[in-house]
Regions:
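Short, small-residue-biased leader/transition segments that mark boundaries at the very start
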Residues: 1-3
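Interdomain/boundary linker segments immediately adjacent to catalytic/signaling cores
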Residues: 7-59
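Acidic-basic catalytic patches of nuclease active cores, encompassing PD-(D/E)XK
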Residues: 49-90
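Conserved catalytic cores of phosphodiester-cleaving nucleases, focusing on short active-site segments
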Residues: 97, 105-120, 144
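Acidic, metal/cofactor-coordinating or nucleic-acid-engaging core segments within structured domains
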Residues: 128-164
């Protein structure tokens, strides 16, 4: 029986009010449950894509990585509240994603291929060092931040995308599913070198999002 028919069959106003009050309590719970189910399905899709990552490209072809992350801002964490449609703030640079953080300021997300080698093939003085491709990606992020900061007093840009103040960039690149403890130590040291760039692998992104969904599930 649909809600409308159920409402009509109620004998008195008191019962009708009780039904309305119950629905007002249940609808948010139903929405949260549905939303959580959708997110878990998306994370399962991400896991499958990583299992068959040779079938997908960074920014070319159908269903590439940059396209896949559109409209999935929640996967980058609770700090990200919106992925903006605008990707260009000048003639020279096209950003993967310009995002608005929870504090209203603008940050960046750069999506690279998970197939990229994170570490160089050989160590330097017995230390793991970034691969050439990772170094290039970090340099690109630093350049994007610099170019964005130059527009900090541009009122037109502020109207279009929001406030620019000490922008940060999240770089999603490579895999860490087969790392050793030594790799993770090197990763922590590498990330500590950059104040406005946060490097994260696809596996770390997936694991963090799964943990967020697990927390949400325990609260519903």
């Amino acid at each position: 029986m649909c809600i409308r028919d159920r409402y009509k069959k109620l004998p008195n106003n008191h019962d009708k009010v009780s039904l309305i009050e119950k629905l007002q309590l249940d609808i948010p719970d139903l929405y949260n449950s549905y939303n959580l189910k959708q997110r878990k399905s998306i994370l399962e899709d991400l896991k499958n894509r990583l299992d068959y990552m040779d079938n997908y490209h960074e920014d070319k072809g159908n269903n590439n990585w940059q396209d896949w992350f559109k409209n999935k801002q929640w996967i980058f964490g609770s700090d990200v509240v919106q992925i903006l449609d605008k990707r260009r703030t000048d003639y020279n640079n096209i950003y993967d994603y310009i995002i608005k953080s929870y504090d209203g300021f603008v940050d960046l997300i750069e999506i690279k291929d998970p197939k990229i080698n994170f570490w160089a093939q050989s160590k330097d003085h017995n230390n793991y060092i970034p691969s050439v491709d990772l170094t290039k990606a970090i340099t690109q992020c630093a350049n994007y931040i610099h170019c964005l900061e130059k527009r900090i007093n541009d009122k037109d840009i502020a109207v279009e995308i929001g406030n620019i103040l000490k922008p940060r960039c999240t770089l999603v690149i490579g895999r860490s599913n087969n790392w050793t403890e030594e790799h993770f130590e090197a990763f922590r040291i590498l990330n500590s070198m950059y104040h406005n760039i946060n490097i994260i692998t696809y596996d770390m992104l997936l694991k963090r999002a799964q943990k967020l969904c697990s927390i949400d599930s325990s609260e519903t």
